[in-house]
A protein has these predicted regions:
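Short, solvent-exposed loop/turn segments at the edges of secondary structure
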Residues: 207-208, 258-260
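Short acidic (Asp/Glu) patches
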Residues: 182-185, 229, 247-248
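Residue-level detector of conserved catalytic or cofactor/ligand-binding positions
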Residues: 264-274
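Active-site microenvironments that recognize anionic phosphate/pyrophosphate groups
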Residues: 1-224, 275
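Histidine-centered divalent metal-coordination motifs
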Residues: 216, 260-264
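Long, well-ordered alpha-helical scaffolding segments within enzyme catalytic domains
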Residues: 224-241
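Hydrophobic "anchor" residues on beta-strands that sit immediately upstream
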Residues: 212, 243, 258
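A short glycine-rich, hydrophobically flanked beta-strand micro-motif that places a catalytic Asp/Glu
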Residues: 242-255
Length: 275
């Protein structure tokens, strides 16, 4: 699980503080025995119950999907280890094999609810045969629709400059705001690629199988040149079970403006088209 036995009291007290509970009448140590599969299935309902409590008791001032996403991320942050702990564990698993390291990190990203399993499962996916071969088609339904109240609030909200974008390293542990998602349950793995600092993370929206992103520590516009291919090869040397590709070095890609050099990666259950 996310919480070791040594951290149970500490974690309980963090949750009590978050929910403004001064007394704990049920007594510490009362546990529900359940399998991992049952725990995964139970998580969204449990978070909903906790958020309902927060709304009813004035802890969560506004209700709605955006506000609930901000708050349930705060709940999960109480259960997530510090970045250094996750990085250390990742490297321990890498000593076994690259696959063991990414298996650990992907499952961790799901268990922390950074990747929301119960939303990702709504995505539509199918394979269509074409004269060029089988084509994987996906319709991503993981991103929640904002309610009108949240849209209006986001329009009026001050446009902050921190973090600089949705992908940069400063998002790790960020509390979020009405116009920027919370990332308190998010962890990033630092890498050295082409003698420069890069960072490895999974995408919360899973556009591809085990969809992850490697990005530069600096906000450098995306450029495709000789060094791009060197970076791609270096990464596949580190993680030979993944396939990857860079974004196009165009001013606007996928309807958004990219101010960060990044690479998309996927675990290829089939040959995949990577943007």
């Amino acid at each position: 699980g996310l919480v070791s036995a040594e951290d149970e009291i500490y974690t309980t007290n963090r949750l009590l503080e978050l929910f403004r509970i001064e007394d704990y009448p049920y007594g510490f140590g009362e546990k529900i025995e359940q399998t991992e599969e049952e725990a995964v299935k139970r998580l969204p309902d449990l978070l909903t119950e906790m958020m309902d409590y927060a709304v009813e008791n004035g802890i969560l001032q506004e209700d709605g999907i955006v506000y609930r996403d901000l708050f349930d991320t705060k709940i999960m942050s109480c259960l997530v280890g510090r970045p250094s702990e996750i990085i250390r564990r990742f490297h321990e698993e890498y000593e076994k094999s690259p696959e063991a390291a990414t298996d650990f990190f992907y499952k961790f990203s799901q268990d922390t609810d950074y990747i929301r399993r119960y939303r990702v499962c709504r995505d539509e996916k199918w394979v269509t045969p074409t004269k060029y071969g089988d084509l994987d088609i996906t319709i991503n339904l993981s991103k929640p629709e904002k309610d009108p109240k949240a849209i209006a609030a986001a329009r009026l909200a001050k446009q902050g400059g921190y973090p600089k974008c949705l992908l940069c390293v400063e998002n790790e542990g960020y509390a979020g705001r009405i116009n920027h998602p919370a990332r308190q349950n998010h962890r990033i793995i630092p890498l050295k690629i082409n003698q420069a600092d890069w960072f490895f993370q999974y995408s919360p929206y899973v556009y591809y199988n085990e969809h992850c992103i490697v990005f530069n520590d600096k906000h450098i516009p995306m450029k495709i040149n000789k060094s791009t291919f060197k970076k791609l090869i270096e990464f596949t040397d580190m993680f030979p079970h993944y396939t990857l590709g860079s974004n196009a070095d165009l001013p606007i890609v996928g309807g958004s403006i990219l101010s960060l050099s990044l690479i998309h990666i996927s675990e290829p259950t089939r040959l995949q088209l990577i943007s």
